[in-house]
Curated annotation (Swiss-Prot):
Binding site for (2R)-2-phosphoglycerate: 162, 349, 378-379, 400
Pathway the protein acts in: Carbohydrate degradation; glycolysis; pyruvate from D-glyceraldehyde 3-phosphate: step 4/5
Transmembrane segment boundaries: none
Role of this protein: Catalyzes the reversible conversion of 2-phosphoglycerate (2-PG) into phosphoenolpyruvate (PEP). It is essential for the degradation of carbohydrates via glycolysis.
A single GO cellular-component term on record: cell surface
Protein name: Enolase
Keyword presence, Thylakoid: no
Residues annotated as the enzyme's active site: 204, 349
Family that this chain belongs to: Belongs to the enolase family.
Name of the gene: eno
GO BP term (any one): glycolytic process
Organism: Chloroherpeton thalassium (strain ATCC 35110 / GB-78)
Disulphide bonds in the chain: none
Length: 437
């Protein structure tokens, strides 16, 4: 029987050189390892990432307390349990912590254990993780959101919006879609060089040039698609996706430039323009009429429910509106959004909620209410590829895991290539069917 014999955690470094938690789970016949990601722009409603705060060690970002919690409290509680009983393990972790936001043990400690247990269970079962979680129906590869140009909190430039992404929707296989993304990435690099712009990359591997405006940023991405030999899609103003091969997705991370005192969106990095919620919603409406935008994540601030409702009423029938800081992978926040009729999609970040079971519950709630799910990385990543497995396990249809550079991002794409190869003729690439708008 796959009984947990030992759970051991260590402190490792993420892609930004900050400490994070890695967990090993040992049973009498299997092994699982998971590393925990970390975000730069984090929602106030996220589960608590436990850090030590001692400025003499990693500038206060050390996670040795979370590591200690795994090696003592959690190890003592879970040793002897069946590693294949995922929901029981996760429930035990929640009860052991006992707080609504996992602040006692730390979401980083809890998540590392939850995911490592799932991997040990898969190892015991002789199955890849996506089959172990999703069963025989786990056959759908995700359409990637590829972050090719960075701004906001992810880059030291004068662009307000955090991510400008491409989505290859006009292809039959994941491997062809990935090739498109890589070729557009290199075309964008050449384009930036030709204009004398910086080709250094941000946290997620996208370029971070100092361009004149937010408009110039999206126009550079659109131009690069054409230079790579691909057809850019049309504006969704009249509904439908047309016959374009590539569409644009945005993550403005609007909470980052929302002034809670003024109750206005302030473009601090560029023009200094200040917009009310009504004006911000109208701004995005105008952009979707002008540009081939299929998805906007966090187009409004995390607690601007009225603004989210305005935006959803304006463009929610033709543009995917993804809640990240709004929903924080939390079923209670998502249920509130569903009731209020805001957004139509949820970003799924495993470390926002803290256990695999809760993550799967959020995806299920979204699906039952007609919301799409986008499985996502964080800006601080590791070589861990669990999110690629979860994307296929849940048939989510979309994944957001960075640009076509930096090994911490490429690791997820390479894992999806391997899964596509394993699935062979069963593999499905949803293309335009990944969207419900």
């Amino acid at each position: 029987m796959p009984i947990i014999q030992r759970i051991f955690a260590r402190q490792i470094l993420d892609s930004r050189g900050n400490p994070t938690v890695e967990v090993d789970v040992f049973t009498d016949s299997s092994f699982g390892r998971a590393a925990v990601p970390s975000g730069a722009s984090t929602g106030v409603h996220e589960a608590v990432e436990l850090r030590d705060g001692d400025k003499e060690f990693y500038l206060g970002k050390s996670v040795m307390k979370a590591v200690e919690n795994v090696n003592t409290i959690i190890n003592d509680e879970l040793s002897g349990m069946l590693v294949t009983e995922q929901s029981e393990i996760d429930n035990a972790l929640l009860q052991l912590d006992g707080t609504p936001n996992k602040s006692k043990l730390g979401a980083n400690a809890i998540l590392g254990v939850s995911l490592a247990c799932a991997k040990a269970g898969a190892d015991y079962s002789g199955l890849p993780l996506y089959r172990y979680i999703g069963g025989t129906l786990a056959t759908q590869l995700p359409v990637p959101m590829m972050n090719v140009l960075n701004g906001g909190a992810h880059a030291d430039n004068n662009v307000d919006f955090q991510e400008f992404m491409i989505m290859p929707i006009g292809f039959d296989t994941f491997s062809d879609a990935l090739r498109c993304g890589a070729e557009v990435f290199h075309a964008l690099k050449s384009l930036l060089k030709s204009k004398g712009l910086n080709t250094a990359v941000g946290d997620e591997g996208g370029f971070a040039p100092n361009v004149k405006s937010n408009e110039e940023a999206i126009e550079l991405v659109i131009e690069a698609v054409g230079k790579a030999g691909y057809k850019i899609g049309n504006s969704t103003a009249n509904g439908g996706l047309g016959d374009g091969q590539v569409m644009i997705a945005l993550d403005p991370a609007s909470s980052e430039f929302y002034d809670t005192e003024k109750k206005k969106y302030v473009f601090k990095k560029s023009s200094g323009q200040e917009l009310t919620s009504e004006e911000m919603a109208a701004y995005w409406e105008s952009w979707t009429e002008k540009y081939p935008i299929i998805s906007i994540e966090d187009g409004m601030a995390e607690d601007d429910w009225a603004g989210w409702k305005l935006l959803t009423d304006k463009i929610g029938k033709r543009v995917q509106l993804v809640g990240d800081d709004l929903f924080v992978t939390n079923t209670e926040r998502l249920a509130e959004g569903i009731e209020k009729g805001v957004g139509n999609s949820i970003l799924i970040k495993v470390n926002q909620i803290g256990t695999l079971t809760e993550t799967l519950q959020a995806i299920d709630l979204a699906r039952r209410n007609g919301y799409t799910s986008v499985i996502s990385h964080r800006s601080g990543e590791t070589e861990d590829t669990t999110i690629a497995q979860i994307a296929v396990a849940t048939n989510a249809g979309q994944i957001k895991t960075g640009s076509l550079s930096r090994t911490d991002r490429i690791a997820k794409y390479n894992e999806l290539l391997r899964i596509e190869e394993q699935l062979d003729t069963e593999a499905i690439y949803p293309a335009k069917k990944a969207f419900r708008v």
